[in-house]
Amino acid sequence: LIDRLDYAVMIRKRIYLTAAIFLLVVSFSAYYLYRVNRSARSRLEYANGLIEVNPRKALADVEQINRTFLSERNYMMCDLVKAGALIGMQEYLVPDSLLNIVSPYFKYKADSLHLTEIYYYRGEIARHSNFLLEAVEYFTLCTQYNNDVYDLRELNFYLNNFKGQVYHTKHMMKEEKEAKLAALSLGKELNNPS
């Protein structure tokens, strides 16, 4: 009977020891993940501040962040800051695909601050690609989500400028169509021998 009690106590001690070690490992892992994400968040905030001044440095800082154990938010912020830095360096192909990845996450989280950035960046991409209708659409969305992130005077200038260009393009297309129809009717008259 005593041997059975000693054996039960020994098993119970092993279970407690295993549970304590498990809790210790889990707490160290959680603390490590917290520190990694906190460090990444501060580096991302620093890099985000550098986008306007030195986009190459911002891009280099984002590239140095190890993304293995990042939270979903920090991972998406890495892509957003990277897209902003690339747009600052006037490279427009890669940021568009990065923004396609990031946009649904911030829409789901209803994060108007970052949605403003996304629409501003998309407007910049469309503006430099001469897609004026898309630029107007994205800058309009940017003004709707804007929480004093961007100067509304600049956005309104872009909007009015692009709306004017779109109107001018549509008006020119109408004149071109009329000129084409006039040329076709003149050609038909010249071909008609009567």
Question: How would you name each of these model-derived features?
Answer:
Residues L1-I21, F28-S194:
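A "functional boundary" signal
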